[in-house]
Each structure stands twice: as structure tokens, then as C-alpha cells.
Design a protein with these regions (language model features):
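Retroelement integrase C-terminal DNA-binding domain
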Residues: 1-213, 217, 221-222, 424, ...
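Mobile genetic element proteins and their domesticated derivatives, centered on retroelements
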Residues: 8-10, 34-37, 161, 212, ...
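Conserved beta-strand/loop block within the catalytic cores
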Residues: 205, 210-293, 389-412, 454, ...
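Catalytic-core region of right-hand nucleic acid polymerases
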Residues: 223, 234, 243-368, 372-379, ...
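A short, polar/acidic, helix/strand-boundary loop motif
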Residues: 273, 602-629
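C-terminal reverse transcriptase regions that engage the nucleic-acid substrate
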Residues: 293-296, 360, 368, 444-565, ...
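Catalytic palm active-site di-aspartate
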Residues: 308-313, 357-367, 391-420, 446-456, ...
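RNase H-like nuclease module associated with reverse transcription
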Residues: 578, 617-733
Length: 733
């Protein structure tokens, strides 16, 4: 059962102590003995590959957790492929406790899964689940699963009807498992440190156990839910209860060392009925990376003190309220037993199968409305302390201190960044947050950690930002072998070439490729912008990755390995808090003839607060037109930065836009085409003419050699030129 990170098992009904047969999930590769040993199993599961054995379906998760009857599950995605496809037989003896539970639950699994058919279930019925995979017509060979629950009819029981999962429901079920690959393994796309309770206890022992118990104790202390006594449960409540899952995570420091083992109970919000929330605004914003870097540049320029705060169990401080539909959640037996020892109300609610069903009173991670309710809660707290949001980023709030100084905070879910020259009022706000939420950890100093980044403010007038820990974890997790020579640039000259004959990646390789590209994108957008051009191209290849794409990914990894411990430095300098932009384009560089845009925004003299490297949406007829499109698209970003800084109290004069194409600048100055060769250009690309006329931006020509902040993000560059342009971009010595 994917929801418990175990396989789907089949057992011979005549067995006294059930043995099991491993079956194939969806259309993926058949599990091998090696894979079987690597997969996390509930206790010591007995496994027997017996080709002739009659078998029924055993849903381990349903056998121990009576819950919602939903089609958004993966336990029915099974296809009997025969023992001939299994590479090797693996047989293990179950523990006595496992055998007892399996024997007790073996004939109640279907009953628990189909609550509405309880009266029709018989203890000796045989359930056969067949999955017929139909080839989807597109080139990616997506599968649409037709799930048929075929209960062998008896004289007293007719055959049941067929149930069908459409493609969207199947995909939602798969996506709810982080990333469920066809070879029956789970990969997180960005964070690879999440573990199940069993994995965490195996790896970290009592530390993980204490973390899990601490999370449950926090839930009880916060009165997160009301347990429903078993006698008061109705079929509607049982059917509508969503599942829950305890995850354990290694919380890492920016230097790559383990900070702590953190546990979190997560609700399966993907099982909630979204039709009940139609018309409601469930969106929740977080502070943008551009805003954070701009605030750090301001702090460096004005020599502000910087402080971070982390609100523990943030969502639990927000109430679910009574205006919406009640949310019922099922808690698995192992966690239910711990809760029952902490609060007698949970002991009275334990059901025959060991689970507990609760009604959520506080917001829990995973519920579709939790993020919105928490944001409203924390924003109200800030409003009560006279903090006013920035109109262009509501997660940035300010107030004027008694001495006239500005106090600024940025909120990213439960992480808060504070900057001010007035330490007294910064401490007052921090104390108010602690009084409101209780469990708040804070840190201040010349070196602070925020959102996985290490920010060094020890040098007057500058802020240096690195993510050494994430770089190290990417390199460690990569399957790339170190090259024989040092890799001095992240992309070869053929980065945009596509070899249609290159063999495609399958299953695990494709999943690992997708995960690694996602992690690199997160890194490149923040502290390694010189890699962004290569990474942005690979993001277009994740659904159809080939061996050639894997080689391009390997080069980026080797570049990081050979050029580690780098970052960016924000230095506003004498120019002050003013927005500037470097815009460039590489004409016709993609295989479909489209051009590539590179853009870098700065606050003050040097250091990127926002970078972009994207494929243009149209085919242009000349390099001049490509540069015009790049300037038109990127000016949007620059104007947003200007508006943000103005709302922060920094009046903006004309923002400088650096360009290396004189013909493009001439077109913008005239605001129209100047010859037969440019008459076809759409008028929408000339809107920047108005911004020049109103003196919001001024165009300044720069030679290509000193356009590094944008040039390095449009085309592959090597040698001394790359080193020089990388320095111009990152401002890192």
C-alpha cells in the first residue's frame, strides 16, 4: 500500500499463517528481491512467491485503519503479471505479532475499505483486484487505470459493479505520494530528508521517538482536535474522515549539518471534498525571494540589526472555525495508542481496529484551508502591533519606531525576518510574538540563517548569502562521477541542442533527474545564478529526459563540486537604494528557433536581488527584435521592484536599464518600427517607450563584455570570459 510505503501483497486463502505474493503496481517495473529488502515494511512481513496459490487482496493500511472510501487511493493499482516476471523469490517468516494481526484482519480488509457494503461482506469471500492499463495516446505513454473490484459471486451474493478511476483521479492519487514512481519507490522532488516513523526510528533511534512523542504532546497541549467516541461515529463520519501521516524530517543547517529531528503530523488534504469550499479564497502568500534580498541589501546599506524568529507549531495557533464544514481525520493505531496515554479522551475514542477519528479544531498541515487561516492569524497579530503591509508584497510589513527608524519584517509561513536600527523596538515586537504564540525561537547576530540560507552581515555595507548545506547535499545525492578534468563552467556549447535519438530515461533514472533539476532550480534562483541558464533549460526536459539530458545535468553537478562554497554578495554602494536592470537575449538559440532572455535586477551598485533565464514565447526575425522582446518582458520585473522599494519608503529616480544592442534602444526611443524589417513587430513590445518618456527608466548602452549579469544567463560561456561575467553577476570574489 503506497500510503504506508509498503508493497501490495496477495495471500493464499487456505494458509493458516498468511504468506504473500508481491505484485506489480501500475505499468512499472516488477519489484526484485533487492528492491524488496530496501522497501520499508510493516514489521517482518512474510513473503512467498507461489505461482499456483489462489489469492485475495490484503490491504494492510485498510486492515488497520478504517477510513474514507475513496477512489483516490493507489492500493487497487495492481496487475498480476505472473511469477515469471519476478527476478528472484524472497521468503521471510513473520513475527508472531504480525501473523496474529494478519490472521485477524485478513477477512476484514475489504470490509474496512468499503464501509457502505459492511452488511454484504462475508468472512470467506475472495476478492480479486485487476488493473487494466490502457495506453494513453500521447507520446509520454501516460496510463489510465480502469479498476475493477471483482468479488467472486456466491449463491447468496451477486457480482458487484465495476468502478472506474479516470486519469485525473489516478494522477491526483499518485501526486499525493510526493512522487510515486513506476518501480514502486518514493522520491521527494526537492526535500529528500523526509522519513516515515519507521525509517526515522531505525536511523535515529530514541531521538526520533522523542521527536514523535513531542509532536503529539504539542498537539494535545494545543487542543488540536476533539476525539469522537467510537459509539457516536456514524457511517457518514467514518466515510468522510481523511487520513493522517506522521512525517519525520532531518532539519538541516545551512552548513549541511543536522540541526534537529523534527516530526509533523500531516492531514491528507488531498482527500478533502473541494466542492465544499467553492467560492472561498484558500490562497496564502509567502514573501518573495526578491523582497528578502532587497531587504537584506537595505539592511546592509543602513547597517541595520537583523533577527530571525521561528514559530513552533504555527498552524496550530489558527482555529478551523465554525463557518466551514467540519473536518474529520483518522489517526493510525500506533499514534492513537500514544495519544491515549496523554489524554483520557483519546483512550475512550479508540475503535476496535485501534484507530481514532477526531474532529479538527485547529489547523493542521495538509488541510486545504490551513495555510490561509494561519496567514490571516499572523497578519492580525502584526496589525495589532502597528505593522503595516507593503502593497506590493503583503508578507513584508513595516512600522515607524519612536526614534523615526523603520522596523521591517518578512513572513514566510512560520519563519520571520526582522531588520531595524532600533533594537529596543525590535525586541518589543519579538516579545509580543512570543507572548502570542509561545514556542518561538529567535536568533540574532552578524551571521543568521533564514530559509536554508546563511546570511553574513559582518562586512560593513554588504550581505553575503550562501547555501553550502544544500550544495553539499545535492552533490552527495547525485549519481554523477567526478570527471577527469575540472569543470569550469556549468554548460557546454550544446546545452540547447536536443538529440532525438538519445535513449530516454526510465523509472528511477527519470525520477532522480526530475528531483535533482528541481533542487538545482531552487539553488540557482537564490545563490548560484550562474547555473540558472543551464538549469532552466533542463526544467523543460523533465517529462521527456534522455541520456543526453542526464549528461548535461552531470556537468552542472561537477561544476558545483569543482566550484563549491560560492554565493552572492549584495553591495548597494554609493548608488543607494535604487533599482537597476541588465537585460539581454540570445537570438534563435533554441532548436525551434526561439530566443532566450536573461535578466538581472540589482538594488544599488552590485549584487542580484532577482534573476531570470527563460525561453521567449515567440520566434523573432532578428537579434534586434529578440532584444526588444527581452527588454519588454523584463521591464515588468523592474517596475515591480521599483514599486516595492517606493512602498518601503525609498523614492526612486529613473531606473537604469543596461542594453548592448543599439538598434533595440533606437526602436524603444522612437516607439515604433523604423524600417521594413521591423514593421511586423507587435505594438505591445513598444510599451517601454512610455516608461522612458515618463523618466521611470533610462536606457544605457554597455558593451557586451561588461554585460555579464545578463549575458551569462543567455548563452554558454567558458574560460576567462565566464569567470569575469560570473563575478559581475554574483559580486562574489
Amino acid at each position: 500500500d503506497p500510503r504506508t510505503e509498503a508493497c501490495v501483497f496477495l495471500y493464499p486463502k487456505e494458509a493458516t499463517v498468511p504468506s504473500f505474493r508481491v505484485m506489480r503496481v501500475s505499468s512499472g517495473a516488477v519489484i526484485t528481491r533487492t528492491q524488496l529488502i530496501q522497501l520499508p515494511m510493516p514489521d517482518a512481513i512474510a513473503v512467498s512467491l507461489d505461482k499456483q496459490a489462489e489469492h485475495d487482496v490484503l490491504d494492510w493500511d485498510e486492515a488497520t485503519h478504517s477510513g474514507k472510501n475513496t477512489d483516490n487511493t493507489c492500493d487497487n493499482h495492481v496487475e498480476d503479471t505472473g511469477v515469471d516476471e519476478v527476478s528472484r523469490t524472497a521468503t521471510f517468516l513473520p513475527s508472531s505479532e504480525t501473523a496474529r494481526r494478519l490472521t485477524e484482519n485478513v477477512n476484514t480488509a475489504s470490509t474496512a475499505q468499503h464501509v457502505e457494503l459492511i452488511e454484504r461482506e462475508r468472512a470467506d469471500e475472495a476478492t480479486h483486484v485487476h488493473v487494466q492499463n490502457q495506453e494513453h495516446p500521447n507520446e509520454e505513454s501516460e496510463r489510465e487505470a480502469v479498476v475493477q473490484v471483482d468479488c467472486t459471486p456466491t449463491k447468496s451474493q451477486p457480482r458487484r459493479s465495476q468502478r472506474v478511476l479516470d486519469q485525473e483521479s489516478t494522477r491526483e492519487a499518485l501526486e499525493s505520494l510526493n512522487y510515486w514512481t513506476e518501480d514502486m519507490q518514493v522520491y521527494a522532488l526537492v526535500t529528500s530528508s523526509n522519513m516515515t516513523c519507521r525509517q526515522a526510528e531505525s536511523e535515529h533511534g530514541s531521538i526520533a521517538t522523542d521527536s514523535i512523542e513531542g509532536e503529539l504532546q504539542q498537539l494535545v497541549n494545543k487542543e488540536f482536535a476533539t476525539p469522537i467516541p467510537a459509539a457516536e461515529l456514524t457511517p457518514e463520519i467514518i466515510k468522510g474522515a481523511i487520513r493522517s501521516k506522521m512525517f519525520v524530517k532531518q532539519k538541516m543547517k545551512p552548513d549541511g549539518t543536522i540541526d534537529k529531528i523534527k516530526s509533523r503530523l500531516v492531514a491528507r488534504g488531498d482527500q478533502q471534498d473541494r466542492t465544499l469550499y467553492e467560492g472561498e479564497d484558500l490562497s496564502a502568500t509567502t514573501v518573495t525571494c526578491m523582497s528578502v534580498f532587497s531587504l537584506l541589501a537595505i539592511a546592509a546599506k543602513e547597517q541595520r540589526k537583523v533577527c530571525t524568529a521561528d514559530v513552533g507549531g504555527a498552524y496550530l495557533n489558527a482555529s478551523m472555525g465554525t463557518d466551514g464544514p467540519p473536518v474529520y481525520m483518522s489517526i493510525e493505531p500506533s499514534l492513537a495508542s500514544i495519544l491515549s496515554g496523554m489524554d483520557s479522551r483519546y483512550r475512550e475514542a479508540i475503535r476496535d481496529n485501534g484507530t481514532i477519528i477526531v474532529r479538527l479544531d485547529k489547523c493542521l498541515y495538509g488541510c486545504i484551508e490551513s495555510a490561509r487561516k494561519w496567514q490571516l492569524n499572523v497578519m492580525q497579530t502584526m496589525s495589532d502591533n502597528n505593522m503595516k503591509p507593503n502593497a506590493y508584497d503583503p508578507c513584508v510589513l513595516n512600522k515607524t519606531c519612536r526614534d523615526g527608524a523603520q522596523l521591517t519584517i518578512a513572513v514566510y509561513v512560520d519563519d520571520i525576518l526582522m531588520t531595524s536600527t532600533n533594537e529596543e523596538e525590535m525586541e518589543e515586537l519579538l516579545q509580543a510574538i512570543k507572548n502570542r504564540y509561545g514556542d518561538v525561537k529567535s536568533h540574532r547576530g552578524d551571521v543568521i540563517e533564514f530559509l536554508g540560507m546563511s546570511v553574513d552581515m559582518s562586512t560593513t555595507g554588504s550581505a553575503s548569502i550562501t547555501m553550502k548545506g544544500m550544495e553539499a547535499s545535492i552533490i552527495e545525492d547525485a549519481t554523477t562521477e567526478r570527471g577527469t578534468r575540472k569543470t569550469n563552467s556549468p554548460a557546454a556549447d550544446d546545452i540547447f541542442d536536443i538529440d532525438e535519438d538519445s535513449p530516454p530515461l526510465h523509472n528511477q533514472e527519470r525520477s532522480e533527474f526530475h528531483a535533482m533539476v528541481a533542487r538545482l532550480l531552487y539553488l540557482a534562483k537564490r545563490v548560484r545564478p550562474e547555473c540558472l541558464m543551464a538549469v532552466s533549460f533542463l526544467t523543460t526536459r523533465v517529462t521527456k529526459a534522455t541520456k543526453e539530458d542526464k549528461m548535461k545535468l552531470d556537468r552542472i553537478i561537477n561544476y558545483l563540486r569543482d566550484n563549491d562554497e560560492r554565493g552572492i554578495t549584495l553591495t548597494p554602494g554609493a548608488e543607494g537604494i535604487v533599482a537597476s536592470g541588465y537585460f539581454d537575449a540570445a537570438y534563435g538559440i533554441h532548436e525551434d528557433g526561439k530566443s532566450h532572455t536573461g535578466a538581472c535586477l540589482t538594488v544599488g551598485e552590485r549584487g542580484p536581488v532577482s534573476v531570470e533565464s527563460t525561453k521567449q514565447s515567440i520566434v523573432t526575425k532578428s537579434s534586434t527584435e529578440a532584444e526588444l522582446v527581452a527588454t519588454s518582458d523584463s521591464t515588468n520585473m523592474l517596475l515591480h521592484l521599483r514599486n516595492f522599494l517606493t512602498a518601503q519608503g525609498y523614492e526612486q529616480g529613473p531606473s537604469t536599464v543596461y542594453q548592448d544592442n543599439m538598434s533595440c534602444m533606437s526602436l524603444i526611443e522612437k516607439g515604433r518600427s523604423t524600417s521594413k524589417r521591423t514593421r511586423h513587430i507587435a505594438i505591445r513590445h513598444f510599451w517601454t517607450k512610455e516608461k522612458v518618456d515618463t523618466n521611470e527608466i533610462i536606457m544605457v548602452h554597455r558593451a557586451t563584455e561588461i554585460m555579464g549579469p545578463a549575458n551569462v544567463m543567455t548563452k554558454p560561456i567558458h574560460g576567462a570570459q565566464f569567470v569575469n561575467e560570473r563575478k559581475q553577476l554574483t559580486n562574489w570574489e
